Design a protein with these regions (language model features):
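Flavin (FAD/FMN)-binding glycine-rich loop and adjacent Rossmann-like elements that form
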Residues: 1-189
Length: 190
């Protein structure tokens, strides 16, 4: 990933249906959304792909990215409750919103070893492999279908997974990935 096109930050959310009707106030400060502007939150959950901030500074703009995500969440729920989704969601209520964003990237620190896709796919053995993982490399990009209304700051992503990872075997992450090669006494994780 380059500085333009970083992966973003997610703010997940959840909703439920109550036994009786639940009101929801208009949210003029939220993003102006209708049901077609976002994927329907199946299973009462807005998952990881409610993500924005791709071309923003993940540290300097962290609060702005989070605020945009929250405006998207509340705008989507407003569409469900007060706009074209209102008939179907009379009993729906917002039950949880992650007010702390989950960033995918921040500083790009380098250890003595940089684990590559080739290392993972070829099951390269490292003598200091200390953390097992079975997750493939995935990159997140704005989903074009939902980026039309806010092309400069889309808030729905999709993931592209790299070459297959043998999930039964996984791969060991070397200890040398976790400390900085040029900043003394700095240990990294994430």
């Amino acid at each position: 990933m380059t500085d333009k096109g970083r992966m973003g930050m997610s703010n997940m959310w959840a909703w439920a249906n109550d036994a009786s009707e639940v009101s929801y106030p208009e949210t003029p400060w939220a993003l102006d959304l209708n049901m077609m502007d976002f994927p329907y939150p199946r299973d009462f959950h807005g998952p990881w792909y409610w993500e924005s901030g791709y071309d923003k500074d993940p540290l300097g703009d962290a609060e702005g990215i989070r605020d945009w995500n929250l405006r998207a969440v509340f705008g989507a729920f407003n569409a469900m409750k007060n706009r074209d989704g209102a008939d179907k969601h009379k009993n729906s209520k917002l039950t949880w919103v992650a007010y702390i964003g989950g960033p995918r990237e921040s500083r790009r620190l380098l250890g003595d070893v940089i684990l590559t896709e080739e290392d993972i796919v070829t099951k390269r053995e490292f003598p200091d492999g200390c953390v097992p993982s079975t997750w493939s490399i995935d990159l997140h990009y704005p989903k074009k279908q939902y980026a039309k209304k806010f092309p400069d700051n889309p808030f729905i992503s999709y993931a592209v997974h790299g070459k297959g990872v043998d999930r039964s075997y996984g791969y060991p992450v070397p200890y040398r990935c976790f400390y900085s090669r040029n900043i003394e006494n700095l240990f990294m994780a994430g």
